[in-house]
UniProtKB/Swiss-Prot annotation:
Family listed: Belongs to the DNA mismatch repair MutL/HexB family.
Name assigned to this protein: DNA mismatch repair protein MutL
InterPro entries registered for this protein in UniProt: DNA_mismatch_repair_CS, DNA_mismatch_repair_MutL, DNA_mismatch_S5_2-like, HATPase_C_sf, MutL/Mlh/PMS, MutL/Mlh/Pms-like, MutL_C, MutL_C_dimsub
Any single GO BP term: mismatch repair
Function: This protein is involved in the repair of mismatches in DNA. It is required for dam-dependent methyl-directed DNA mismatch repair. May act as a 'molecular matchmaker', a protein that promotes the formation of a stable complex between two or more DNA-binding proteins in an ATP-dependent manner without itself being part of a final effector complex.
Entry GO MF terms: ATP binding; ATP hydrolysis activity; ATP-dependent DNA damage sensor activity; mismatched DNA binding
Gene3D superfamilies: 3.30.230.10, Histidine kinase-like ATPase, C-terminal domain (3.30.565.10), MutL, C-terminal domain, dimerisation subdomain (3.30.1540.20), MutL, C-terminal domain, regulatory subdomain (3.30.1370.100)
Alphabetized Pfam families for the sequence: DNA_mis_repair (PF01119), HATPase_c_3 (PF13589), MutL_C (PF08676)
Organism classification: Bacteria, Bacillati, Bacillota, Bacilli, Lactobacillales
Record carries keyword Chloroplast: no
């Protein structure tokens, strides 16, 4: 009696489904990729209950014949490869013939299809992989596949599904990646009757990016291009000032296929070099065209892992393309951006000259109990026509018209403000240990901060500053040197910690509301976690496509910090995912105190410096910044006398010590 048996085909398909169909988003990916392979120009994805109840993909592609339709549910039956040589030169997204049989084995599937060569189409209905109906019907050219009751016969898989909003976010992400990979295809995603994504299918990658990430984001992205004998690299990368808290916005495409590759991600970051702050990542869409012989996609069932020959050469090509593109830009933030309505000045980069330290005009306002920067006059006259000419305005209007969908309503600038994300206002050397993804370090830091006791601060008399960074003061214990950034960071941390801890119903109405734009998946995730934002006094309302509107702000948040502060909180919420209100508030206080504090090379006037020391003296722990760095150091009178050899231990003379 033999112990080895051949498994039934349906059971084999269900086993394969364990690898191919991880969640509803996997079904959407496989069906849409099949539609793209069928040379479709329009693809519509409709889902109900995040795909668990129903997924329907409709395309206008080539369709299937009546004879081929039942074969599509047979395992390893495909029209995309026919010989071993085809396996090493794959030009389609699918090729194994596993996806459709795997999906059919764990759901009820209905397929309507027709080719342009025949006058009628075909209908197939199967449940659990078993064909129940196969008949001729009237249907337009193309294919419509409906998947219902997903995982109905594999209840164990249902237990591992996340919330409906989380599963929907995965589906949106899949459709967005495929839209970027194939801008020539018009994609539409509809969830429970609500349209979430729509692209025009014009073939313009920049327009596809605008449809997914928003117009404001697209305006701050640069085109890149590079090529050698084996690779062609093109796409768009964001300016260093436009970053996100994770790598989810870095999209790498190889021959129209979205892939995950650690080394290529590393090459992208290398192209930016030191222009990115630590823990921040750019928005990138890079399209790589390569000879299929140099890429092996037959590595993983999801086909997202691809082995690439000459990978090091490709890395160098990507890094060079990004670095060269950034070199051509003036990366200094434009102070006249709001007036000129232009995000970047496209000037040739001038030769850099070392300038002496000069005062930045930082002053203290005793009424607001805060510092402010006094605007300084521009020393060099800039021709007014460079910024305000009609040519500039006209070009910007044309750019907006090209990127905005025709159906989108343009909101007047007087009714709302479009919030911009925070720029990189401190470098990676400021706080290399500040990384919200390192939960253990953050937890230890928060525990230490909670256990701080009130300290007694010495009475100091300020008398000077060095290099716009260190303050000098004297006290009865000698000379004190204070790090002005660390000092104000401690002051601001305790301010934000107390104010955020006092969150209640005290809100300030905004005369002009703010609009906040997000990607589709982030928009859905934030809707699910909105209660956490409400806890800290942030109430965002849905306002159009992937956009929230803020009509009021908490009183602890200064009005000039609304745009950057709300984006920072949303990024933190998306990154940490499961976070307690207590930890959320503490992390926010640490982050905002660091970003809102004065930096090095800011010269303070005497009044501002003295008030900073007064504020520091009132802190619970004035000796360390929230990250543990010392705020001040002390040289006692005895230390000074020893350094100048005014006193010697045991009164030993210099001659006795052999110095003379």
């Amino acid at each position: 009696m033999t112990n080895i048996i051949e498994l039934p085909e349906v059971l084999a398909n269900q086993i394969a489904a364990g690898e191919v169909v991880e969640r509803p988003a996997s079904v959407v990916k496989e069906l849409v990729e099949n539609a793209i392979d069928a040379k479709s120009s329009q693809i519509t994805v409709e889902i109900e209950e995040s795909g668990l109840k129903m997924i329907q993909v409709t395309d206008n592609g080539e369709g299937m014949s009546h004879e081929d339709l039942p074969l599509s549910l047979r395992r390893h039956a495909t029209s995309k490869i026919k010989s071993q040589s085809d396996l090493f030169r794959i030009r389609t997204l699918g090729f194994r013939g596993e996806a459709l049989p795997s999906v059919a084995s764990i759901s009820k599937i209905t397929i309507k299809t027709a080719t342009k060569e025949v006058t009628h189409g075909s209908l197939l209905i199967a449940t659990g992989g078993e064909i129940e109906t196969l008949e001729a019907i009237s249907t337009p050219t193309g294919t419509k596949i409906k998947v219902e009751n997903l995982f109905y016969n594999t209840p164990a898989r249902l237990k591992y599904m996340k919330s409906l909003q989380a599963e929907l976010a995965h589906i949106v992400d899949v459709v967005n990646r495929l839209s970027l990979a194939h801008p020539e295809v018009a994609f539409t995603l509809i969830s429970d009757g609500r349209q979430l994504t729509q692209t025009s299918g014009t073939g313009d990658l920049r327009q596809a990016i605008a449809g997914i990430y928003g117009l404001n984001t697209t305006k701050k992205m640069l085109a890149i291009s590079n090529a050698d004998l084996d690779f062609e690299v093109s796409g768009y990368v964001s300016l260093p000032e436009l970053t996100r808290a994770n790598r989810n916005y870095m999209t790498i495409l190889v021959n129209g296929r979205y892939i995950k590759n650690f080394l290529l991600n590393r090459a992208i970051l290398d192209g930016y070099g030191s222009k990115l702050m630590v823990g921040r990542f750019p928005i990138v869409v890079i399209d790589i065209q390569i000879d299929p012989y140099l890429a092996d996609v037959n590595v993983h069932p999801t086909k997202q892992e691809v082995r690439i020959s000459k990978e090091r050469e490709l890395m160098a090509l990507i890094s060079t393309a990004i670095s060269e593109s950034l070199k051509e830009q003036d990366l200094i933030p434009d102070a006249l951006e709001n007036l000129a309505k232009s995000s970047t000045r496209h000037f040739s980069k001038p030769e850099q000259t070392q300038l002496p330290l000069q005062s930045r005009g930082l002053y203290y306002d005793p009424q607001k109990n805060d510092f402010f920067v006094k605007e300084s006059a521009v020393s060099e006259k800039i021709p007014e026509t460079d910024f305000y000419s009609g040519a500039v305005d006209n070009s910007i209007k044309v750019e907006k018209a090209e990127l905005l969908p025709h159906s989108e309503e343009v909101i007047g600038p007087s009714s709302v403000k479009h919030a911009s994300r925070p720029q990189n206002i401190f470098t990676e050397t400021d706080h290399p240990n500040l990384d919200l993804k390192n939960r253990q370090k953050l937890s230890q830091m928060l525990t230490r901060l909670e256990n701080e006791e009130k300290s007694v601060f010495p009475e100091l008399d300020y008398f000077g500053q060095m290099h716009g960074t260190y303050l000098f003061a004297q006290g009865k214990d000698g000379l004190f040197i204070i790090d002005q950034h660390a000092a104000q960071e401690r002051v601001k941390y305790e301010y934000y910690r107390d104010k955020i801890g006092e969150v209640d119903s005290s809100l300030q109405q905004l005369l002009v509301p703010y609009l906040f734009e997000f990607s589709g998946s982030d928009f859905i995730n934030l809707q699910e976690k909105m209660a956490l934002l409400n806890e800290v006094g942030i109430f965002l309302e849905v306002y159009g496509h992937n956009t929230f509107i803020l009509r009021e702000h908490p009183i602890w948040m200064k009005e000039e910090e609304i745009a950057s502060g709300v984006y920072e909180m949303c990024d933190m919420l998306l990154l940490t995912n499961e976070v307690s209100i207590k930890t959320y508030r503490a992390e926010l206080a640490i982050m905002m105190s660091c970003k809102r504090s004065i930096k090095a090379n800011h010269s303070l006037d005497d009044y501002s410096a003295r008030n900073l020391l007064l504020q520091l003296a009132q802190c619970q722990n004035p000796y360390n910044c929230p990250h543990g760095r010392p705020v001040l150091i002390n040289f006692s009178k005895a230390d000074m006398e020893k350094m100048f050899r005014r006193i010697q231990e045991n009164h030993t003379s210099l001659r006795e010590l052999g110095k003379y």
